[in-house]
């Protein structure tokens, strides 16, 4: 029986990028409070690569005395069969879903290697993603306020409230062009909406955070500074949240949310539609 203090190796295996396996694996493992030693093996599309992977699985089993967990997605039946025979608990992350869809719509699936996000198969999607990322990077942390008419959304908040990681996630995963602007200490006195934002009010969205958590984050960056003090964090947050309320800017508290959750809630509250899947 697995205990909370006992660690276990976890492998994410795919004949593609393994991103899907990692994502679903993280969701599942998040419900089990044990220490996971995670390893990812992408592009396992040949007997040679599978043999190398199985060696790692066997070493894990021999070293730890318990079977590792393997979340996998493999198209070739022979590779899948060999993996299932290894000393591990193996979970095909797509099989049950694909089978259910097949049964419901009465259509045979046609799986292919590395189907997702291939540049050759969907050039427009690829370049749309790159354009969104480039725009977002160029407008990160208040670097530039030019071209706001091209923005899908403008994130506002104090420094270290989660704006940059959320912006990049929304660009990479949703294909959205995101501007993020930080309110720093110099802005707090007489805080008001920038003139550049007035005609883009419908794009404004605020991120806030509990002062205790903000202090903790800032302490990791600049320990012992006024910037990281509880009083400073409380002062900045109180003024920025007052601005959000005064200007009717919707906002959420990011304290206990992951980047994925923040991004999804922003879409939900703004009605924005993701451009890419």
Swiss-Prot record:
It comes from the Bacteria. GO terms for molecular function: ADP binding; ATP binding; phosphotransferase activity, phosphate group as acceptor; protein serine/threonine kinase activity. Keywords: Kinase, Nucleotide-binding, Serine/threonine-protein kinase, Transferase. ADP binds at residues 157-164. The keyword Transferase applies. Its EC number is 2.7.11.33, 2.7.4.28. It catalyses: [pyruvate, water dikinase] + ADP = [pyruvate, water dikinase]-phosphate + AMP + H(+); [pyruvate, water dikinase]-phosphate + phosphate + H(+) = [pyruvate, water dikinase] + diphosphate. HAMAP family: PSRP. Bifunctional serine/threonine kinase and phosphorylase involved in the regulation of the phosphoenolpyruvate synthase (PEPS) by catalyzing its phosphorylation/dephosphorylation. Belongs to the pyruvate, phosphate/water dikinase regulatory protein family. PSRP subfamily. NCBIfam families: PRK05339.1. This is Putative phosphoenolpyruvate synthase regulatory protein. It comes from Vibrio vulnificus (strain YJ016).
């Amino acid at each position: 029986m697995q205990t909370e203090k006992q660690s276990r190796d976890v492998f994410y295996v795919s004949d593609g990028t393994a991103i899907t396996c990692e994502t679903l694996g993280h969701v599942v493992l998040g419900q089990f409070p044990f220490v996971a030693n995670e390893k990812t093996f992408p592009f396992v599309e040949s007997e040679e690569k599978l043999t190398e992977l199985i060696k790692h699985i066997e070493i894990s089993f021999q070293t730890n005395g318990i079977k590792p967990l393997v979340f996998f997605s493999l198209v070739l039946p022979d590779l899948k069969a060999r993996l299932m025979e290894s000393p591990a608990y193996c979970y095909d992350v797509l099989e049950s879903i694909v089978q259910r869809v097949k049964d419901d719509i009465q259509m045979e699936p046609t799986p292919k290697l590395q189907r997702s996000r291939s540049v050759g198969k969907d050039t427009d999607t690829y370049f749309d993603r790159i354009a969104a990322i480039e725009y977002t990077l160029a407008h990160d942390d208040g670097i530039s306020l030019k071209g706001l008419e091209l923005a899908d959304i403008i994130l506002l908040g104090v420094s270290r409230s989660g704006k940059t990681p959320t912006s990049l996630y929304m660009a990479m995963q949703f294909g959205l062009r995101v501007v993020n602007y930080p309110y720093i200490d110099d802005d707090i006195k007489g805080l008001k909406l920038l003139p550049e934002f007035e005609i883009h009010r419908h794009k404004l969205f605020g991120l806030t955070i509990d002062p205790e958590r903000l202090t903790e984050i800032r302490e990791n960056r600049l320990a012992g500074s006024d910037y990281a003090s509880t009083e400073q964090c409380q002062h900045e947050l109180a003024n920025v949240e007052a601005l959000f309320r005064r200007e009717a800017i919707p906002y959420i508290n990011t304290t206990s949310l992951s980047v994925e959750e923040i991004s999804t809630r922003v879409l939900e509250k703004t009605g924005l539609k993701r451009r890419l899947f």
